[in-house]
């Protein structure tokens, strides 16, 4: 065997002699390795996102790199303390000392790394996705990511509806048609703040979003409910932030068309609104149609330096409307058009300097074309138009250890109710038959409300890393608004009631103003004696400082102090509210690689709706005053006196507002949270948070001339105002007042809840978010126009809040298969909202008319009947979407169908509403009496769409 010739006997003998020595050496090495210890852990960014490619090294020893889940395993020597160092590009390095480990032992640890400011434009336009664990702070709330925004069923492409799936957020019960639809922690929806990329997006007069943002331009919807950073202010409840989409490294875009065909695809509503005949209401449902068109485009305007994105959405719908009287039924129509536009350009001047230009606007118009007995010429159009234009500049220095973000924004808003076809040179006329039953309304509309707002905002936030453990943030925010309001409680040309004695002709049951003869019999004439122009301002100022302290690599403590000032508190008889200091403290402890313990405590100041100031002027001593002339005092048709012709000292007593006669303060909440998050494997996490909120200084209406009469056990019928006037401190007289009201800050609400949430994220395949909120909200006021039913006894009004629901369970899911099929859905279950029993709208104390009751529905109750003492039935809503992608060349065509209220469940609560008076939530009688349902959530509705994406 020549190939083995080198193995001589002598060499084989030497090998066998060396074998025991080699075996002993191998055993020693194996023993040494068995005696070694291991360090196992997870490295995360401060946000909680696992960090891949982070280097973990024993100083003077071995090192390793984290995997895609941020995990690592490192063998270390035993019997002595070791220094471990963690580094990763774009983050502050961190070090810690490991205690001596025993042979074969294992040490588990979790670390977070503080990010450096990375302002290269590529980083600005590519923000990271939401992590399973929040390792940064104790803020509660949640996020709806971009992939969910575009896949989940969304009626009317309204992103606000998706916010209802976030813990602590629910559908709001408002008090006017355009009331904000989102409530946080059972509070009034007026106090929820809205931002776009951190900048103000609030309609300042009352509240709610200034700009209706296009869904196609939205990258992420975030809600901060509790224990959030001192950087955010002006709300005692929470903040809704729209994060806008940016252009990427390649051009992408979409064009889409949506259609809501209505009946027969939609189900018919089984609830007929009060006053309408079922057959007429069913016929009106046949007239609904909606079409939506739009698109979005984005990409590199100049690769590596400039990126842009823009979106445009248009909606057109019509709704047939039928209102019935005992004598006449007419088919009417409302035409609705909405435009939404948004655009953003990001430009990188250098790796440390980036500028963003941002623009958004929306214009919503609802044009009434007549309804019931209202002729088209007498109907109104509702217009809500808002815009924002802003610039943000980001800069960094010291290698990203210091940074600054400065932003300037100009915003506008208009809310107007002009006549659809006519002008205010024509009065409104109500035509009565011989039995005094209205049979027609012609002429023009019967009120003026034209409000405009212009706002400048400047915001600056600076951040400095002070060594390894401290990150200091400080900033200020100023928003200056000017408002213009033209308001009149009637048509400037007056409002007539005339009787048709056979001398007013009609065509097919329709009447026209031009056909009313000059000698028609006038039953009454009503005019606002003092139409009002209110041009005032509001200034909001905020300053904050916050230290993010990391005493260990797993523990983050945020200690902040914020100060806010609303200069409305300095108007009238009030003194400036300058003591709004808000200390905030939160902890976030990464106790184990997959376990976070968090908690927070702090104070949160809100701002006042501008309307509390404007209303006090508009309805003040020199403000609006409506007067009616009847019978012999009624003028001839067309010859009624105008406001300038009236002697106000001869007019009957009314309600007059005083400007903050008792002083006013900004709303302030104290909040406490405590919770734990647990990662379940690589793709899931669960959390439980306890929340407590105590909100004080809520504005409400106070009567400075309150009557002393109270409701007794035997009171069951209405009494004249003269009875109530006798118990007022100042007896009402001609030219004076009956109620002398002011807005004051004695309102209080409390909220206690438990948020339980589960999240499963399989990236491109399945995303599931589910939560259960168990809570209780109590309040003694519901709105700025909330009045006590008896004098100023607000203790008797303390009850479950209008937006309280004890249980709310929500789940949303998006599942994308490998064959282009995407299915998604939302399920929302909640217990019923409170129901308020009133005494058949009777005036049991002779208090007279009260401004605000028509909005809120808090009319007088029978003796012993508590406010909101009963509940509407629970609600269950399920929405579903099915989409299929077809590849066409290098693009994709998506065909999609969506169904809302899939099971066609009849829900009497659990849906956003802005019905004045409360709808079904306001019932007459006493507890246990039958409930009459006049409103309900929409029945099953179907929406179809097609989209082309490239």
Model-derived features with residue positions:
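Short amphipathic beta-strand segments in non-cytosolic proteins
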Residues: 44-47, 54-65, 89, 123-132
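Periplasmic N-terminal accessory/gating domains of Gram-negative outer-membrane beta-barrel systems
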Residues: 67-71, 90-110, 121-246, 276-282, ...
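A short, solvent-exposed beta-strand micro-motif common in secreted/extracellular proteins
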Residues: 80-90
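Transmembrane beta-barrel wall of Gram-negative outer-membrane proteins
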Residues: 252, 284-366, 381-410, 583
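Gram-negative outer-membrane beta-barrel transporters
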Residues: 552, 683, 687-837
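Solvent-exposed loop/turn elements at secondary-structure boundaries
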Residues: 577-579, 587-742, 857-860, 873
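C-terminal beta-signal and adjacent terminal beta-strands/loops
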Residues: 683, 696, 701, 818-858, ...
